């Protein structure tokens, strides 16, 4: 794994790529990169939102790199990635929310990597259906949009996002024939029943894949961890989710 990790790191630096693995200070970077998988972040390294859990810099986004779609596609090719995950910062400063750039990136990846399956982890595009349509048109295998937390904590955790808007986005994508996925962070002060309710809400929006993980504080400035959720509780969540999905 270490050799592959070093090789990937060199490639990312040489191509000046933004991976959320690095900028988000993900603790599992060695494991994923060692296995030859990575998540690419497009649209720059500065986010227009300031979610309390995330280590990505906040500010006015920089100019889009028109060569980025090609660079990402080329890197996936060089790395031999079989399943690529692409995400982006929120670009509320752009008229189209970055959706054109997103579509170009997916098209470019397809062109250079016809056998690679694609997962796009998208922002909410402020619920703008025209922007969501651009993602639908390029038809990634999976479209992810993370709800992140339960409704009660949503305002505190993801300040400029809205719980109901995220559900709307997921339902809109599902109704358009997309395979949708969402993620929840646990250990932020939510109750078990609130997680169950969120799973029910996601299911009602047509979501077919949900990931649940432990929230980890990336720096002391970020939202504190309320609790480390016991593996048995995660098992309860898994079983509940599987029952909901029947």
List where the protein language model places each region:
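Auxiliary Fe-S-binding modules of radical SAM enzymes
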Residues: 1-39, 70, 104-115, 130, ...
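N-terminal pre-triad scaffold of radical SAM enzymes
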Residues: 18-57, 72-78, 82-85
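Short acidic, gly/pro-rich beta-turn/loop elements at beta-sheet edges
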Residues: 36, 50-52, 96, 130, ...
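Short connector loops/turns at beta-strand edges and beta->alpha or beta->beta junctions
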Residues: 45-48, 81, 148-150, 215-217
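Core AdoMet radical
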Residues: 56-71, 78-129, 135-168, 181-185, ...
